[in-house]
């Protein structure tokens, strides 16, 4: 397995679009997010793996255990790996036991338009405004470091991602983001300032973000840690269906010999 241009047109078809965190994967392949790729052949690949700048990794469809082992070892040769892997995978090949597993839930994708989202937007409290994300606003946001880390810079996020804040005058009440966009789907996330939690602002903020996504023809995907009950409740309010459990399988970098 050797490096290949992550934007190679031959790569997207190798990957299952139903993989967990697929908007991140296809965002990397489409050049919206930083990342790297390796493949068995740089000209006509049949096996490939992709890794985000923050370490989340994806392996293409495989039919044999040997192919999966080869791809995972290829990733681990150069970095610590967090492999996104569905708990309900039915393939004959399975990854080797990880050093640790982070249990996650994936929801969707679902359309970014609908009556439920319209009603949530109508619930915007009096005196609260919606402000699109810009550099000055993002500099004040709680999740600035997360989106900057995912994109490599604030400017890159503002170019390739989408965000907004719910504001009361100059106070940030909630931040909603679509940091990962790929394959026609945006993964969305939200954080409410601690003083304003429990007021339904998280789902309202995402509903307003969804209007922007719908204008761009994008669907919505949601993911969170299994034990994040508040996030699961927000997903339900937004209209996401049953969760699909998956794991981020954490592997140490292989020792150099």
Question: Can you describe what each PLM-predicted range is?
Answer:
Residues 1-22, 114-154:
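Short amphipathic alpha-helix that is part of the acyltransferase structural core
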Residues 65-71, 188, 198-214, 233-237:
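Conserved acetyl-CoA-binding loop-helix of GNAT-fold acetyltransferases
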Residues 100-113, 241-255:
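Conserved catalytic-core motifs of GNAT/GCN5-like acyltransferases
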Residues 190, 220-224:
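Conserved hydrophobic beta-strand within the GNAT/NAT acetyltransferase core sheet
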Residues 32-140:
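Acyl-donor-binding surface of acyltransferase catalytic domains
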Residues 44-45, 171-174, 230:
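Glycine-rich acetyl-CoA-binding "A-motif" of GNAT/NAT acetyltransferases
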